[in-house]
């Protein structure tokens, strides 16, 4: 019984709230607009005049202040012919003739049926502006008439600290910004639309004023005034009804803001408890004596310590001590103590927090309606639109129930956040009260920790509401967007039920009570249009009513450059019935509305996901603030305080709602989970990108993690000592210098060019400088010229070093992620013993998992073999066709049917075999990792294999090459069979289903994958790096060989002879005391070149072997496809990959070849 009473009371309360609006219809973008009426009549005492026909009246204060955002004001349309009434609740027009004293909010009877005024040449701009020099009458072409659409109405943004009504002159010429609301909006590319009382969309008057330059900050928080300007007011009648859509600070009371303001006033007001208590402590005689004694002792200890040489008073130390003495001295002054500490310290923790929260709330208000999320959700306009869904769709009732449940949870989450905020506020007050005691503790080292803890607590409790409401603001932006998208349509009141003649009896009586009631006390809200159909929806250029980002051609590739538009700032073509929905992005929802489906359940699902995230954030905000301020070990947990404050109330109200929640939540639980996962993935992706950027910077900084660097060296063969940390910048600078010599340098971007390989860069520069397709299209002379240009800029070497540095960054990121994936956290990455333990624990877990998977795989493999025998026997007995027809009943067909969720369309049996291969590779990978850890080097890298060969360890080389070959086969297969465009499908599909064109595409795709493999392989990518080393060493040795040959006139010089010949040549060509030093330098250079040549030659040959192995494996797959083609009697499509590799000669062979 109590449950029913509660639910009934809640629904009645919300229904009453939805009926509180005085409008007959609500616009699509109206979620609680500020409304203001401006009458064309004034009391006689308010009117002043210099002479007859030159009256001036005061400006009407709207009681609102502008906030710097686009000021959007709409004038309600009014048309008597279309059914609008001459009542204060509907009239939005005025007449300059025939008015009487009682026509403040209504038209004179004679004016009601007059036509709207028209003007010669549409010259609305030449009205009676607030300029005393303008004495011209409006150029009306059809007097007498009525003024509509804001004609004659002006707004004034008064300059700060000015009063436009202080004198008649200030009323005529006020200081500030004055604009006419009656201008034709079509001239600026957009229109205002509003629903009339009869339910029709009509064009309306208004203005969208956007500030220029410094005016935004100059006029922020300036008061807003309105006035209908005329030269003679005594015969005016009527009014304008205004809707302020954006641009003012909403001062309407918030459900919970009143409570916080009340407590703030009691605690921190002019005569608040905190100030009184603080002053009482300072006024206590005992306190003053104690502070004086402490200050005297501090000065004495300072002087004594300085005299005996116990402290060294530097300038900085002296200033600090004088500052401390000055601060404590202020505590002795009763009159100045509170003023000083409040204005220079405490204000940051009280008013500063409040200002930050206000900025956060304004940023979260991404559209019309209350800045408070709760205020938006329970506004009469929102609830009216919500309840309009009840009779237009059978899902409307479910949506309303879900909305109310969501509203319930949001209320308690925000209530919980408010309790945390108020508790923090009270705690800040208590900490401030103790300030006079703890501030004295900063004098001595033994008590300084008490002062620091006091200050740290003050910071912690100030941060808690900031972090908390920042999270709430972020989540509320998501909820707001969904509310605007799902309820962003117009609604109108309709008599419901229609009582016929009875309505007419009560009509006039009801209109006196509330003009919006119409003819019946029984009514309901219905959407406009009430039915779907494309003819009921109309496109137009309008002001977009919510914050959004404009993505156009100029920023399509870089969204950071896209323009961010505030609500009502930018113009776009949209349906006037659905102004929040973008024609492209929201096409699905628009189609639902056009088809008559007004209920959008996916929106309510996202709201529930946001509520879940908000609840999680509420639980972590306090601990986050404590962690930042270093007070996470506090004995006081503010969350427990707030939990106890509303726990009993929550339990009581939850009881009747639990049944409703369980009844309606079951069908949507799975979709909520999916939405939660999607939202979590979004945040995870953003966080991951941020972390990857941080790791890229960390890899090249002095703070790079040594354990990760060792992991990179061990697993990827890249030593951080070999990496030039500024290589990327040097490469960009080199490109920038080169571009200065190009004719069309403005067409090229340094950042884009720096991402290219050297060959691609050369092609790009060739096209820019010579207007050709690429480098190959150049003539011999042009190639020589360009090669010299590139060589002078040293771009090839710079590109190689930059690519090597990027590879190191990528390896650093991967190593960091791999270590984290193995359970090595922040401490493990810095503590060797802990890291070794975590590595061992990870290996044990992987082995246990592999063992379990292998055990399951063996059982499945046995059963798959058994079903395969049954299937083969069935094929022999019945034949293939009958087997396929009856297979599902006679054998376990699921083992041999296609897995349609598998990109390669393998059978389950084939998939088992591939899983077994994957387990074998995992064991191989663990074995390679074990070997790598043992030698602390990348055992598969060409560099390490060359070092082993030079050390004479040929057996180890062969063993490691065998491991490298196995891993390479797996890497090639992984690339060839990856999702998207696999080169090879399942065996059964290839035998029975694959077509000629599919197999040709597979072979063509294999060629593309081969190029990708060569490009991304971390070993083959180093070829350019060693090519440059090889070429430099080769060039130096050839030059040395040529000089020796010319000097000694001999063509038969061996490598072994060259050092002694170099020494002899230096003696023959040089004299002086530095000759020995010169000989040593020349021989060292020669030995370095020999070493670089031989080492780079060996590494490059190993890289070439790896490329050949990749090619062989890809060709093996191509051959396999061709065999399937031959079995299917298809024409041959043999297209093997050819490797245009090279084998480099030894140094001795190369020098012999020179002779």
Curated annotation (Swiss-Prot):
Q: Where in the cell is it found?
A: Cell membrane
UniProt GO BP: protein secretion by the type IV secretion system
Q: Name one GO cellular component term.
A: plasma membrane
Write out the transmembrane intervals: 289-309, 395-415, 424-444, 459-479
Q: Where is the lipid attached (S-diacylglycerol cysteine)?
A: 20
What residues show lipidation of type N-palmitoyl cysteine?
Answer: 20
The protein's UniProt keywords, in alphabetical order, are:
Cell membrane, Lipoprotein, Membrane, Palmitate, Signal, Transmembrane, Transmembrane helix
Q: Where is the signal peptide?
A: 1-19
PROSITE patterns for the chain: PROKAR_LIPOPROTEIN (PS51257)
User: How is this protein positioned relative to the membrane?
Assistant: Multi-pass membrane protein; Lipid-anchor
Q: Which family does it belong to?
A: Belongs to the TrbL/VirB6 family.
- The protein, known as: Uncharacterized lipoprotein RP108
Source species: Rickettsia prowazekii (strain Madrid E)
């Amino acid at each position: 019984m109590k449950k029913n009473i509660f639910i009934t009371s809640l629904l009645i309360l919300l229904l009453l709230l939805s009926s509180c609006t005085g409008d007959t219809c609500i616009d699509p973008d109206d979620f609680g607009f500020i409304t203001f009426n401006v009458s064309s009549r004034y009391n006689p005492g308010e009117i002043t005049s210099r002479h007859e026909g030159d009256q001036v009246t005061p400006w009407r204060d709207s009681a609102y202040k502008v906030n710097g955002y686009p000021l959007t004001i709409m004038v309600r349309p009014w048309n008597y012919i279309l059914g609008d009434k001459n009542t204060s609740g509907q009239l939005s027009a005025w007449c300059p003739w025939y008015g009487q004293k009682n026509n403040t909010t209504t038209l004179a009877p004679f004016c009601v049926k007059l036509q709207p005024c028209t003007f010669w040449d549409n010259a609305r701009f030449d009205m009676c502006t607030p300029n005393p020099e303008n004495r011209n009458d409006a150029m009306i072409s059809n007097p007498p008439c009525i003024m509509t659409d804001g004609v004659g109405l002006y707004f004034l943004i008064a300059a700060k600290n000015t009063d436009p009504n202080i004198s008649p002159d200030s009323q005529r010429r006020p200081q500030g910004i004055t604009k006419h609301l009656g201008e034709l909006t079509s001239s600026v590319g957009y229109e205002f639309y509003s629903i009339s009382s009869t339910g029709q969309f009509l064009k309306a008057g208004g203005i969208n004023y956007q500030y220029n330059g410094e005016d935004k900050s100059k006029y922020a928080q300036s008061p807003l005034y309105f006035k209908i300007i005329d030269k003679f007011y005594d015969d005016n009648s009527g009014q304008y009804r205004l809707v302020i859509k954006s641009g003012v600070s909403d001062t309407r009371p918030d459900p919970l803001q009143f409570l916080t303001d009340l407590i703030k006033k009691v605690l921190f007001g002019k005569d608040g408890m905190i100030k009184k208590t603080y002053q009482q402590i300072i006024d206590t005689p005992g306190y003053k004596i104690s502070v004086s004694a402490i200050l005297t002792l501090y000065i004495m200890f300072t002087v004594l310590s300085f005299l005996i040489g116990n402290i060294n008073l530097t300038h900085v130390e002296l200033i600090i001590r004088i500052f401390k003495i000055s601060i404590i001295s202020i505590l002795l002054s009763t009159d100045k103590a509170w003023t000083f500490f409040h204005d220079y310290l405490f204000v940051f923790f009280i008013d500063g927090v409040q200002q930050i929260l206000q900025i956060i709330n304004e940023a979260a208000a991404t559209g019309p309606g209350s800045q408070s999320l709760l205020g938006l959700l329970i506004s009469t306009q929102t609830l009216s639109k919500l309840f309009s869904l009840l009779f237009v769709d059978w899902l409307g009732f479910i949506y309303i129930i879900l909305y109310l449940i969501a509203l319930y949870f949001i209320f308690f989450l925000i209530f919980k956040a408010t309790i945390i905020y108020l508790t923090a506020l009270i705690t800040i007050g208590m900490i401030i009260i103790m300030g006079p005691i703890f501030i004295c503790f900063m004098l001595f080292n033994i008590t300084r920790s008490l002062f620091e803890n006091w200050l740290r607590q003050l910071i912690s409790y100030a941060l808690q509401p900031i972090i908390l409401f920042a999270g709430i603001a972020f989540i509320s932006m998501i909820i707001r967007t969904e509310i605007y998208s799902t309820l962003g349509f117009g609604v109108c009141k309709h008599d419901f039920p229609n009582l016929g003649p009875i309505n007419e009896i009560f009509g006039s009586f009801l209109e006196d009570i509330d003009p919006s009631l119409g003819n019946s006390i029984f009514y309901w809200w219905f959407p406009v249009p009430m039915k779907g159909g494309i003819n009921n929806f109309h496109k137009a250029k309008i002001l977009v009513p919510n914050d959004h980002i404009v993505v156009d051609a100029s920023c399509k590739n870089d969204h950071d450059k896209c323009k961010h538009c505030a609500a009502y700032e930018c113009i776009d073509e949209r349906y006037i019935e659905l102004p929040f929905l973008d024609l492209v992005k929201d096409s699905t929802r628009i189609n639902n509305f056009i088809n008559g489906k007004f209920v959008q359940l996916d929106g309510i699902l996202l709201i529930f996901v946001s509520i879940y995230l908000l609840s999680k954030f509420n639980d972590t905000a306090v601990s986050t603030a404590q962690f930042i301020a270093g007070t996470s070990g506090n004995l006081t947990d503010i969350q427990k305080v707030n939990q106890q404050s509303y726990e009993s109330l929550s339990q009581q109200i939850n009881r009747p709602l639990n049944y409703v929640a369980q009844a309606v939540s079951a069908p949507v639980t799975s979709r909520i989970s999916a939405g939660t996962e999607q939202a979590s993935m979004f945040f995870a992706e953003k966080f991951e990108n941020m972390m990857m950027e941080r790791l890229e910077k960390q890899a090249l900084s002095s703070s790079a993690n040594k354990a990760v660097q060792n992991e990179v060296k061990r697993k990827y063969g890249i030593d951080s000592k070999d990496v030039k940390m500024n290589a990327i910048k040097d490469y960009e600078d080199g490109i920038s210098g080169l571009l200065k010599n190009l004719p069309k340098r403005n067409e090229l971007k340094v950042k884009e060019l720096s991402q290219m390989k050297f060959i691609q860069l050369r092609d790009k520069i060739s096209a820019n400088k010579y207007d050709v397709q690429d480098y190959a299209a150049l003539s011999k002379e042009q190639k020589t010229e360009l090669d010299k240009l590139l060589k002078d800029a040293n771009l090839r070497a710079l590109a190689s070093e930059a690519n090597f540095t990027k590879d190191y960054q990528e390896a650093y990121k991967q190593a960091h992620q791999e270590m984290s994936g193995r359970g090595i956290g922040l401490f493990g990455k810095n503590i060797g013993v802990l890291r070794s333990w975590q590595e061992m624990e990870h290996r044990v877990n992987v082995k246990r998992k592999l063992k379990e998977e292998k055990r399951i795989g063996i059982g499945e493999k046995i059963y798959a073999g058994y079903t395969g025998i049954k299937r083969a026997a069935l094929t022999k007995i019945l034949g293939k066709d009958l087997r396929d027809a009856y297979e599902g009943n006679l054998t376990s067909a699921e083992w041999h049917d296609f897995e349609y969720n598998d990109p390669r369309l393998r059978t389950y049996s084939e998939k088992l075999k591939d899983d077994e291969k994957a387990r074998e590779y995992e064991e191989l990978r663990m074995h390679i990792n074990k070997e790598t850890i043992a030698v602390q080097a990348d055992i598969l890298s060409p560099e390490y294999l060359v070092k082993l060969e030079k050390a004479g360890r040929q057996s180890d080389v062969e063993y490691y090459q065998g491991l490298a070959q196995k891993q390479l086969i797996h890497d090639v297969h992984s690339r060839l069979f990856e999702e998207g465009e696999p080169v090879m499908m399942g065996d059964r599909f290839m035998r029975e289903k694959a077509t000629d064109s599919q197999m040709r595409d597979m072979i063509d795709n294999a060629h593309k994958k081969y190029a990708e493999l060569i490009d991304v392989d971390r070993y083959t990518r180093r070829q350019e790096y060693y090519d440059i080393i090889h070429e430099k060493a080769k060039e130096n040795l050839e030059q040395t060989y040529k000089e020796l040959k010319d000097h000694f006139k001999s063509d038969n010089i061996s490598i072994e002879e060259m050092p002694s010949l170099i020494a002899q040549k230096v003696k023959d060509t040089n004299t002086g005391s530095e000759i020995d030093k010169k000989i040593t330098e020349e021989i060292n250079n020669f030995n370095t070149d020999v070493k670089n040549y031989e080492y780079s030659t060996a590494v490059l040959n190993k890289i070439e072997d790896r490329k050949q192995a990749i090619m062989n494996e890809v060709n093996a797959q191509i051959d396999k496809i061709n065999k399937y083609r031959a079995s299917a009697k298809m024409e041959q499509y043999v297209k093997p990959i050819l490797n245009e590799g090279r084998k480099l000669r030894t140094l001795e062979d190369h020098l012999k070849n020179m002779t």
